[in-house]
Swiss-Prot record:
Domain RRM: 11-88
UniProt free text on domains: The RRM domain is necessary for mRNA stability and mRNA translation regulation.
Highest taxon listed in the record's lineage: Eukaryota
Classification via PROSITE patterns: RRM
Protein's UniProt name: RNA-binding protein 24-A
InterPro entries xref list: Nucleotide-bd_a/b_plait_sf, RBD_domain_sf, RNA-binding_reg, RRM_dom
Annotated GO biological process: 3'-UTR-mediated mRNA destabilization; cell differentiation; DNA damage response; mRNA destabilization; mRNA processing; mRNA stabilization; negative regulation of cytoplasmic translation; positive regulation of 3'-UTR-mediated mRNA stabilization
Species annotation: Xenopus laevis
UniProt keyword annotation of RNA-binding present: yes
One of the Pfam families matching this protein, by short name: RRM_1
One Gene Ontology CC term in the entry: nucleus
Location, primary (coarse class): nucleus
Protein role: Multifunctional RNA-binding protein involved in the regulation of pre-mRNA splicing, mRNA stability and mRNA translation important for cell fate decision and differentiation. Plays a major role in pre-mRNA alternative splicing regulation. Mediates preferentially muscle-specific exon inclusion in numerous mRNAs important for striated cardiac and skeletal muscle cell differentiation. Binds to intronic splicing enhancer (ISE) composed of stretches of GU-rich motifs localized in flanking intron of exon that will be included by alternative splicing.
């Protein structure tokens, strides 16, 4: 004759987090208050015989098992354990509010914009301390101003007639030493061209008045007297 095995899906309880001094009898004693117990065993190491810190309790009926699992973290033998149905597996312990550790997700809208960096250039990460933000530096856009000097009519207009005349007075016309025996014709003149043809019409008249005609000095030949 073959004996049929009883279904323990809703009656077998997993008990984890047990202290090493917990025994089968002490485990049974704790769960007796919830109902009849068919089996209570602490899993031990085969070589050392010491407890591995968990065990199993099989209650007589499903209602007793539900009462035993109502508190998921009971105190057994002076230590907080975790209790759950065996087919569901071990239930994680509930951490106290004062001991909860977590990293708060930083929303991009709550980040201050340091140094004028736009918000879309800052990409916060989830695992960084609040307030510590590594900004993502965007390449600087090219400047719209030209790096070259603007040679326009406005630039030439700043040179007045007096400044232009003073500049030309620094270079007086003189005869070379080799031509001291010759006399050049007096009264000849030449016109100085405009600095640029792109100058404004108003500045062209000022430049013409500034440069004018240059009358060279009469040369005297000392040796021909």
């Amino acid at each position: 004759m073959h004996t049929t095995q009883k279904d323990t899906t809703y009656t077998k309880i997993f008990v984890g987090g047990l202290p090493y001094h917990t025994t089968d009898s002490s485990l049974r004693k704790y769960f007796e208050v919830f109902g009849d117990i068919e089996e209570a065993v602490v899993i031990t190491d085969r070589q050392t015989g010491k407890s591995r810190g968990y065990g199993f309790v099989t209650m007589a009926d499903r209602a007793a098992a539900e009462r035993a699992c109502k508190d998921p973290n009971p105190i057994i033998d002076g230590r907080k354990a975790n209790v759950n149905l065996a087919y569901l597996g071990a239930k994680p312990r509930i951490m106290q509010p004062g001991f909860a550790f977590g990293v708060q997700q930083i929303h991009p809208a709550l980040i201050q914009r340091p140094f004028g960096i736009p918000a879309h250039y800052v990409y916060p990460q989830a695992y960084v301390q609040p307030g510590v933000v590594i900004p993502h530096v965007q390449p600087t856009a090219a400047t719209s101003t030209s790096p070259y000097i603007d040679y326009t009519s406005a630039a030439y207009a700043q040179y007045s007639a007096a400044a232009a005349a003073a500049a030309y007075d620094q270079y007086p016309y003189a005869a070379s030493p080799a031509a001291t025996g010759y006399v050049t014709a007096a009264g000849y003149g030449y016109a100085v061209p405009q600095p640029l043809t792109a100058a404004a019409p108003g500045s062209a008249a000022a430049a013409a008045a500034a440069f004018g005609q240059y009358q060279p000095q009469q040369l005297q030949a000392d040796r021909m007297q």
